[in-house]
């Protein structure tokens, strides 16, 4: 009898454990569906906004434009930026599709990752200045500016670009973002660190999931598809490496990933 009770007790625990696990999986799927719907809504907005602007500028110019040629040129420049924005969204969607279908291919070459980071920082300097955020690089802890790695330059450039761009988007007035390099013998550790608004601890485990948004109030004025960090994670992992995040709300965030040194 005691043995039967033990078996029944064990079976009951197993069933309860299975029920709890199933409940967690269902909740996870529900949240994913919620995030997916929100993503599609955001995507529609992110595409419509620049397209309507482009259409407005082009119609004005087709009707003869304005007398001031400087304004006409400004219209063309804004339309060009709108096209770049739409192109960026389409490229993100194409990339995440390739990742999910395991069709992502790397074109690996020898890359000086410090020089690559400098290029990315310089390309985002004007945006950072508009938000009164300073950008800097610290390679001294790695011992050299000549840090060669074998990687896909465009893909790692996208990783750095996304991380630095996010740091600017969620930075604070008179804030600072720094890209740091550390020598780990066989690997190089790269950090993108800021003193911005930070992230609540409860959000960190899901931060790299597709469609996941930390807080609507945070992202309302930033835009984007919500795929950026998911893409970053996949691109780093495609190089056989890992990415991590440390963050404290109100104190800033540090994203770090490794690359194999040559």
Named regions from a protein language model:
Residues 240-241:
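Conserved glycine-rich
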Residues 81-89:
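Short alpha-helical segment of the dimerization/phosphotransfer core of two-component systems
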Residues 174-186:
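Short beta-strand/loop element within the Bergerat-fold HATPase_c
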Residues 167-168:
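Short helix-loop "hinge" at the ATP-lid/N-box region of the Bergerat-fold HATPase_c
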Residues 199-213, 233:
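Short conserved segment of the HATPase_c
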Residues 62-70:
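Short acidic helix/loop segment immediately C-terminal to the autophosphorylated histidine
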Residues 101-106, 144-151:
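Conserved micro-motifs of the catalytic ATP-binding
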């Amino acid at each position: 009898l005691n043995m039967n009770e033990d078996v029944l007790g064990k079976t009951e625990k197993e069933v309860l454990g299975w029920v709890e696990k199933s409940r967690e999986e269902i909740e996870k799927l529900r949240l994913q569906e919620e995030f997916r719907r929100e993503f599609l809504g955001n995507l529609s907005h992110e595409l419509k906004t620049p397209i309507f602007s482009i259409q407005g500028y082009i119609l004005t110019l087709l009707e003869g434009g304005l007398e001031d040629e400087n304004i006409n040129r400004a219209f063309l420049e804004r339309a060009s930026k709108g096209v770049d924005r739409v192109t960026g969204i389409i490229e993100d969607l194409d990339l995440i599709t390739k990742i999910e279908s395991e069709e992502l291919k790397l074109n690996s070459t020898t890359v000086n990752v410090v020089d690559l980071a400098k290029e990315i920082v310089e390309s985002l300097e004007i945006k950072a200045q508009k938000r009164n955020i300073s950008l800097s690089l610290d390679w001294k802890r790695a011992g050299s500016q000549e840090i060669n790695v074998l990687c896909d330059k465009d893909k790692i450039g996208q990783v750095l670009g996304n991380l630095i761009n996010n740091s600017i988007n969620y930075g604070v007035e008179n804030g600072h973002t720094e890209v740091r390099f550390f020598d780990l013998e066989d690997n190089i550790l790269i950090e993108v660190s800021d003193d911005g608004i930070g992230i609540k601890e409860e959000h960190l485990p899901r931060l790299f999931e597709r469609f996941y948004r930390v807080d609507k109030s945070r992202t309302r004025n930033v835009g984007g598809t919500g795929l950026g960090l998911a893409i970053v994670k996949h691109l780093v992992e495609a190089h056989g490496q890992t990415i991590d995040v440390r963050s404290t709300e109100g104190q800033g965030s540090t994203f770090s990933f490794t690359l194999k040194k040559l």
